[in-house]
From Swiss-Prot:
GO terms for molecular function: structural constituent of ribosome. Disulfide bonds: none annotated. One of its GO terms (biological process) is translation. It comes from the Bacteria. This is Large ribosomal subunit protein bL32. Belongs to the bacterial ribosomal protein bL32 family. The gene is rpmF. GO terms for cellular component: large ribosomal subunit. Pfam families: Ribosomal_L32p (PF01783). The keyword Ribonucleoprotein applies. It comes from Synechococcus sp. (strain JA-3-3Ab).
């Protein structure tokens, strides 16, 4: 016979939300760090498509 589940306490729900939010903040921080590295030219450990320069576009 089916039995209703127990309600999750607010403390547990808030703790799970805080963990989720912390992970999201960490990912955002990492993305900003990579973005800053690309813009400053200090990138060494990853690849990304480079935009064509004006000289290359003029030759075509």
């Amino acid at each position: 016979m089916p039995v209703p589940k127990k309600k999750t306490s607010k403390a547990r729900s808030r703790r799970r939300y805080a963990v989720w939010l912390g992970k999201a903040k960490l990912q955002a921080q990492r993305a900003m760090t990579i973005g800053r590295a690309i813009l400053s030219g200090r990138n060494t450990g990853f690849y990304y498509p480079k935009a064509k320069s004006e000289e290359e576009e003029g030759e075509e």
